[in-house]
Amino acid sequence: MKYLNPNHAMLVTVPRIAAVFFIALQLLGMKVYPGGTMYDASTQGYSFSKNFFSDMGAYAARNGEPNYFSMILFAMSLTIVGITFISYYLLLPKLLGNNRINYILTWVGTLFAIGGSVCMIGTGFTPSDVVFAPHVFFANNIFHCFLVTAFLLSLIHISGAHETSENLV
């Protein structure tokens, strides 16, 4: 068996596995969601076009039935992705920080990515029907944090000064 570089595992293999788990858990969560939408509590199951993503993480479905299984799957999937993102972004300064400016930009981007990842996990553990304000805070800040991360990492990419070593990946 070929030696697996640990950086390759954390930057390529683990994120792929996490993505598969995320999709599988979300699809299963949609399948077991009891039903109801914001405008029609009588609908059966989860509607991709009429339910909010966060409905799967609610304590009770929009039709009033308990939503425990879907809620657990929702929290698990967001936790898996959040932990994977934290691990991934902690390796980026080593990969992209080939000069002082890139190193600083990558670390600042990483800090925002960690913030976004924590917010992702927080979204999974704050059901919107039980603790609405914290849920919205976490959900909104996923996007705010990752926007800053994407901007900073784009600057590194656009500058073209991001040569990486073959040994890292």
Which residues does each predicted region cover?
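Cytoplasmic juxtamembrane regions at transmembrane-helix boundaries
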Residues: 84-112
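Individual transmembrane alpha-helix segments
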Residues: 60-94
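N-terminal signal-anchor transmembrane alpha helix
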Residues: 11-38
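Conserved small/polar residues in nucleotide/adenosyl-binding loops
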Residues: 156-164
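Extracytosolic (periplasmic/ER-lumenal) interhelical loops and adjacent juxtamembrane/interface segments
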Residues: 42-66
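Membrane-proximal helix-loop-helix units in multi-pass membrane proteins
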Residues: 112-153
